[in-house]
Amino acid sequence: MTSPIHVMSEIGKLKTVMLKRPNVEVENFTPDMMERLLFDDIPYLPIAQQEHDNFAETLRQNGTEVLYLEQLSAEALDDGGEEVKLNFLEQMLAESGYVAGVTHDALKEYLLSLDTQAMVNKIMGGVRKNELDFVPADLVSAAEEDDYPFFMDPMPNLYFTRDPAASIGDGLSINHMTFAARQRESLFMETIIKYHHRFANKGLNVWRDRNHDTRIEGGDELVLSDHVLAIGVSQRTSADAIEDIARNLFAKSHFDKVIAIKIPHNHAMMHLDTVFTMINTDQFTVHPGILGEGGHIDTWTITPGKDGQLSLDHQTDLKKVLKDALNLDDLDLIPTGNGDPIIAGREQWNDGSNTLAIAPGVVVTYNRNYVSNELLRKHGLKVIDVLSSELSRGRGGPRCMSMPLVREDL
């Protein structure tokens, strides 16, 4: 039986991917809500959708099957039946702050009045207070911010499908995300894996589920080979979560090495894949801003120890660590912005390091990062650049916007 999830590298030919087309959620908020929702700007939706459609069509033209999170979610709920749909809605309401009470009941009645796809779209897009024809009479509602316009916040980060879950081998992690604005997102993926006919009862391994206090996000999880992962110790992924998933992988899979890479804990470099990506068997992009004197950075190579314990080896020479882990004689670390501190900073901010490999040496990038793109071409890469003026306002690039489900083995 062919597994519906099969990812043994960052660079194997991309056969199936999951995207989320930007919808009302990316403009259904005001500037004073941006910090709460982890956004820096409000995209112009019609152009963002055109750009995303261009991205999806680029993938299709290169032989990739494109699936959509919003459609899979609705199909999974329909596949699961009425009880699954009710349980999903109760969990979503609880994670939105409504376990019981009149507001809970009104939201539940309203959302269940919609067909399944419309319900999913509404949850993703946010439920405003003026959409429900009732006056809250419970203490919870009375004590809330009277002028806040939403009962349920929109989820504008959903088009970054990379983060709520991560495909690893013939399984995945379903992630407990760091900030409240994104924590509900992984409930969609949990539902898809459990109930969608494409994934349910197919023997998929869940290496780590979303029911943890420690946090991890898919932008920090890179599958370097069928034995080696790199995971960022970042603003969004904690060291204890990395140890947890390493233990699970070592016990139940063929993965036997995890390289933890510590990066600056800030919004511009929120995930490892915003500063470091694998693009060929021996080529990587790297943002110079994460490297210290002599090109050093803190890494810990984690391997199985005795009696289920972990063995850690701390090193600071990233190039040597990668060569040793991947059995390479040499490798090519290609600096974002050609190493120029101004260009590198600007292009990293606009996801110049966030490349998506769709085959060995073939990458999809944002067209706005023209210095980095030209440098990749000079290093022998085939670069397919896509439109990016509005999509980039969300602070995520082609890798962020895609969750590979199936890649060919190398």
UniProtKB/Swiss-Prot annotation:
Record gene name: arcA
Record key words, sorted: Arginine metabolism, Cytoplasm, Hydrolase
Entry-linked InterPro entries: Arg_deiminase
Name recorded for this polypeptide: Arginine deiminase
Pfam families: ADI (PF02274)
Listed transmembrane segments: none
EC number assigned by the record: 3.5.3.6
Top EC category: hydrolase
Gene3D superfamilies the record matches: Arginine deiminase (1.10.3930.10), L-arginine/glycine Amidinotransferase, Chain A (3.75.10.10)
Keyword Membrane: no
Gene Ontology biological-process annotations: arginine catabolic process to ornithine; arginine deiminase pathway
Similarity remark: Belongs to the arginine deiminase family.
Functional pathway: Amino-acid degradation; L-arginine degradation via ADI pathway; carbamoyl phosphate from L-arginine: step 1/2
Major localization listed first in the record, in broad terms: cytoplasm
Reactions accelerated catalytically: L-arginine + H2O = L-citrulline + NH4(+)
Subcellular location: Cytoplasm
Gene Ontology annotations for the cellular component aspect, listed alphabetically: cytoplasm
Molecular-function GO terms, alphabetical: arginine deiminase activity
Catalytic residue list: 400 (amidino-cysteine intermediate)
